[in-house]
């Protein structure tokens, strides 16, 4: 909103692990050196796909990056269950999935690739957003990565019981937010949005 600072949380991985090997794609000459460069690369390789779809990045076997992905129809020979620092910190409470995984029920890779395209668009817009922690908060829009399952668990609530109004209400008030008039939700996404808003 004009004249207001807005903090928005989005539920996807903002980048791949880098701290463990010193690179997103070790040994690849074209490996991006920064998160914004990674977003630009994903956008370049997926530019023809609509609605920020990131599938082309995971399916192009001619690119060296493919060797690091567990992708539909092909498990790269360099794929490992690497974790970012933020995921290592979360392990004592919950178990985030590896961002390089693009298949199966625990897949977060495809959604994160779409998210990276979104981050590229937001940060390159005429009125750019700041994507923290890769850029400091600024006037206007700042976007941060969220992990709703963690927010439930940090206050002793069960994320699997998201449809239970009492469980959701307890989770929200656990973050010192006012009790909701109604904690009934129509979907898990709605429950995630409400607990994330309270946590932020």
For each predicted feature, which ranges?
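RNase H-like (RuvC/DEDD) metal-dependent nuclease/polynucleotide-processing core
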Residues: 1-200
């Amino acid at each position: 909103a004009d004249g207001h600072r807005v903090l928005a949380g989005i539920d996807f991985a903002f980048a791949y692990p880098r701290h463990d090997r010193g690179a997103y794609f070790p040994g690849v000459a074209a490996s991006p050196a920064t998160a914004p460069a990674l977003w630009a690369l994903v956008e370049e390789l997926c530019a023809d796909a609509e609605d920020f779809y990131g599938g082309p990045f995971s399916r192009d076997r001619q690119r060296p990056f493919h060797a690091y992905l567990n992708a539909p129809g092909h498990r790269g020979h360099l794929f490992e269950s690497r974790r970012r620092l933020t995921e290592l910190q979360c392990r004592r409470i919950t178990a985030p999935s590896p961002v390089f995984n693009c298949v199966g029920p625990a897949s977060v890779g495809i959604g994160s690739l779409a998210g990276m395209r979104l981050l590229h668009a937001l940060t390159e817009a005429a009125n750019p957003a700041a994507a923290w922690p890769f850029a400091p908060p600024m006037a206007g829009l700042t976007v941060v990565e969220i992990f709703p399952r963690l927010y439930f668990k940090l206050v002793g609530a069960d994320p699997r019981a998201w449809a239970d109004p009492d469980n959701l209400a307890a989770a929200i008030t656990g973050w010192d937010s006012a009790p909701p008039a109604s904690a009934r939700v129509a979907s898990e996404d709605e429950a995630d949005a409400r607990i994330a808003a309270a946590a932020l």
